[in-house]
Amino acid sequence: MDHQDSQRGLLAQWIEESSRIVFFGGAGVSTESGIPDFRGAKGFYHQDREIPLEQVLSIDFFTVHPQAYWEWFVQENAREGVAPNAAHRFVAGLERAGKLSAVVTQNIDGLHQRAGSERVLELHGNWSRLICTGCGERFTLDDVAAARSGEVPHCPACASVLRPDIVFYGEMLDSDVMEGAVRAISEADLLIVAGTSLVVYPAAGLIDYYAGERLVLMNATPTPYDSRADLIIREPVGQVFEELGRRSRRP
């Protein structure tokens, strides 16, 4: 058995022995679904663009230039074939089996829900949901055709500009979501952290609430928390869970 097989085997064993698993995921969970991560070599931050991504995704930029934001949004949502990958499907299966307490995700793509997960805590929101900046009414992308065309969408009720239900740079994370994440992680008997560099706070600091003895870090590059991990896996996230899925189906 090689080192990778040994690591996967240990992770499979820990999953089998656990009943309060929390999966804490970042952008690297969705790269195998066709969505670039942020800080990888091919990530959003390394793409040539006229306006830096952090500026496009700031609340100040959106407030002043909503048209430019929605044009970027349509371009990013034009990616073909984006669908849940093996990681999303495996995690959803853990929830159905009664072994998963929660998914805590930094992603805004909604792929965990599309895979069937229901206990999802979205730290940074979900860009398939819209909120009216005037009356606070909520909509989905399917409710407002303009949001998919690159036009600035307006509220059908009060005509104010609609914004995506995400946490822009310059905004605070939702306190209820953070409290739910802290509670789930503090009660977990296995914490699997995948596809995140753990350098963005306050999200990265959630690991400090984990009191268990089995911390798994699964990321392509080292993280500031590696010294605290009980298992470190340097493989693509979806690839690992695809293999774990095959193992679980074997007689």
Model segments located where?
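Conserved catalytic core of sirtuin-type NAD+-dependent deacylases
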Residues: 1-251
